[in-house]
Amino acid sequence: MKKTALVIMAAGIGSRFGKGIKQLAPVGPKGEIIMDYSIHDALEAGFNKVVFIIRKDLEDEFKKVIGDRISNITEVAYAFQEIDDLPGNFTKPADRTKPWGTGHAVLAAKKVLSEPFAVINADDYYGKEAYVKVHDYLVQDHPQDGPMHICMAGFRLGNTLNDNGSITRGVCHIEDGKLVGVTETHNIFKTADGAETRNDDGTAETLDTKSLVSMNMWGLTPEFMEILEKGFVEFLGGIKEGDIKKEYLLPELIDQLIHSGKAAVDVLETKDEWFGVTYQEDKASVQAAFKKLTDDGVYPEGLYQ
């Protein structure tokens, strides 16, 4: 069996969630957290390694809540995303407190990855179908010449909306099943008729709820890490003095690779509903959703019993 890894980005500070570490909030009937379901679905689909990207200061609590339990059923590795972990002679601006973004998070796992891998957010529930499709893509043989072949799980925007506040989504532009561009779209709100994005000037634009969006679930290769590292150096070199919030984002880098002809991204559409704990108010509805999935037999009571 070809080795494949699930890489979980769990280093976010959870600033929108309020008190507590949102990635570790129990949501399942037996106290499971969202990552339990993600790992369950990934292992069921054929993944056989899990890499947690976390902050070093959260390591002990993280292992207690989930890490040690998962290490009993599959291979586990840890990578630490630290704000001062920068290449070469780059140094962190003294007043920067914001993490460097999803690109930097994945780069933190470079030393523990030598196999094809899927990347997900720790606090997102993706459903079962996406793991099967991404895993099956990663174990296929792809042409070695030409652009690098990677994939993305595409979710319908209407299946990813939030009842309790605004969200950011990477809206995808697709031709013949290939991703041709990603537009990072901010301030998306659920409306009675669907969805809209609200601009700073007070105007709003209606969005197509059937359009596919990126939920940061990518199927990538070890070779991608080299490009990711080079891109981060270029990103740091291009930051204007005084900019302490600019982030190195995975969708933006992949967008650049597509336009330069360096990557071909296959979009694997999933019709599953996404949900996650973005805001404190989301927790009750997410708990109810997992209870229903359990009652309906999608998941057993007690995932790993």
Locations of regions flagged by a protein language model:
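A structural signal for short hydrophobic beta-strand segments in well-ordered beta-sheet cores
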Residues: 24, 171-174, 267
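Conserved nucleotide-sugar donor-binding
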Residues: 217-229
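Glycine-rich N-terminal loop/short-helix segment of MobA-like nucleotidyltransferase
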Residues: 2-29, 45
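Generic C-terminus detector
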Residues: 282-305
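A C-terminal functional module that forms or caps the active site or interfaces directly
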Residues: 229-263
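Short, surface-exposed amphipathic charged segments that create phosphate/polyanion-binding patches used
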Residues: 88-99, 165-170, 281-285
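Conserved core of the sugar-phosphate nucleotidyltransferase
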Residues: 128-217
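Conserved N-terminal catalytic core of the sugar/cofactor nucleotidyltransferase
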Residues: 1-8, 32-119, 126-127, 131, ...
